[in-house]
């Protein structure tokens, strides 16, 4: 790594420590040219794909929006916050596993529906009715028969 003080190309690692959470590595470095010390931090960069909405616009992945939608569907249902967080984690893992730069919002909606179906059937029906814009009882009946 280049020294930030003198620009020397090769610095030496004097000390390495991992953070308590294990997600960051702290390194103390020394420059053999100017003998100054400095600290660097290393962490994995996990870039979530951009979300492509139905109208073609793009936005960043926002975990809080998905959590809010799930919590609305799960209102007054016997599902814990930990279960919701675990489901959100699985959705994020699937997003990262796609290795795509962009993901259609419809795909995320389907992932949310699958997770809600596992957590609570009533919440699944609530979410599906809004997500799929149900307009009649027949659509509810078909969805419930598929469960």
Swiss-Prot record:
PROSITE patterns associated with the record: ATP_CONE
Signal recorded as keyword: no
Native species: Methylibium petroleiphilum (strain ATCC BAA-1232 / LMG 22953 / PM1)
ATP-cone domain span: 49-139
Alphabetized PANTHER family for the sequence: TRANSCRIPTIONAL REPRESSOR NRDR
Pfam families named in the record: ATP-cone, Zn_ribbon_NrdR
BP terms from Gene Ontology: negative regulation of DNA-templated transcription
Name the record gives this protein: Transcriptional repressor NrdR
